Amino acid sequence: MSQAAETLDGWYSLHLFYAVDWASLRLAPKDERDALVTELQSFLENTATVRSSKSGDQAIYNITGQKADLLLWFLRPEMKSLNHIENEFNKLRIADFLIPTYSYVSVIELSNYLAGKSDEDPYENPHIKARLYPELPHSDYICFYPMNKRRNETYNWYMLTMEERQKLMYDHGMIGRKYAGKIKQFITGSVGFDDFEWGVTLFSDDVLQFKKIVYEMRFDETTARYGEFGSFFVGHIINTNEFDQFFAIS
């Protein structure tokens, strides 16, 4: 039996994707639409207060293409807090005009593939804590996609030795380091939580960097032989004070 990688786990993560039912929203009176937006703004401004206490974070993006219109990403210390947020969001009047298109449940994760030997408690290391309990960068653009490590008769990631996986992940990580300062990456583990094994969330002020890093990593052995991917979502940041314009119908 191959040795399983150990993980450090941080905040729980919930990506929620919605399409706006513009046809139904268009039929609502303007004063009702204004009230819907005000209620939504108030809700999201309230959930964002966790930033000041460093007990979570969130990000809101306008997704490009027909897979979704909105992405709401929430990070919290407990899974049940994500349940509460989702339930309360579904009770908002705007929810009657939003169609869920996708969601992803996971937890911020760091593996021990590239970790050095140390006797210290990793959860007390400031650098590790900043990655497990992050302050999101709120860059102009976001990219999210789920992924698996392939396991079939020809290529099975889970049958490789720890040493083989460490070597592959080292080479994989060296490509990522080339994009330091251009892309901020968050890996969330989802084995037992969702249909894929990991979620990858990328932030950048230059949307083209997403294409560059994903394409370059296609030639990396870790990805070429063992990577399997779900749908990609990309979008531009939207602030709550921009909702009036976003939901405006002339």
From Swiss-Prot:
EC number(s) stated in the UniProt entry for this protein: 1.3.98.5
Keyword RNA-binding among UniProt keywords: no
An MF annotation (GO) of this entry: oxidoreductase activity, acting on the CH-CH group of donors, oxygen as acceptor
Residues the record lists as binding Fe-coproporphyrin III: 131, 145-149, 172, 185
Alphabetically ordered keywords of this record: Heme, Heme biosynthesis, Iron, Metal-binding, Oxidoreductase
Cofactor requirement: Fe-coproporphyrin III
Gene3D superfamilies: Apc35880, domain 1
Coiled-coil residue spans: none
Pathway named in the protein's UniProt entry: Porphyrin-containing compound metabolism; protoheme biosynthesis
Cross-referenced InterPro entries: CHDC, ChdC/CLD, Dimeric_a/b-barrel
Keyword Oxidoreductase: yes
Top class in the EC scheme: oxidoreductase
Any one of the GO BP annotations: heme B biosynthetic process
Domain of life: Bacteria
Cofactor descriptive note: Fe-coproporphyrin III acts both as a substrate and a redox cofactor.
Catalysed reactions listed for this entry: Fe-coproporphyrin III + 2 H2O2 + 2 H(+) = heme b + 2 CO2 + 4 H2O; Fe-coproporphyrin III + H2O2 + H(+) = harderoheme III + CO2 + 2 H2O; harderoheme III + H2O2 + H(+) = heme b + CO2 + 2 H2O
Active-site residues, as the UniProt record annotates them: 145
PANTHER family, A to Z: COPROHEME DECARBOXYLASE, HEME-DEPENDENT PEROXIDASE YWFI-RELATED
NCBIfam families per the UniProt record, alphabetical: PRK12276.1
Known function: Involved in coproporphyrin-dependent heme b biosynthesis. Catalyzes the decarboxylation of Fe-coproporphyrin III (coproheme) to heme b (protoheme IX), the last step of the pathway. The reaction occurs in a stepwise manner with a three-propionate intermediate.
Family under the similarity heading: Belongs to the ChdC family. Type 1 subfamily.
Protein name: Coproheme decarboxylase
Organism: Staphylococcus aureus (strain bovine RF122 / ET3-1)
Lineage: Bacteria, Bacillati, Bacillota, Bacilli, Bacillales
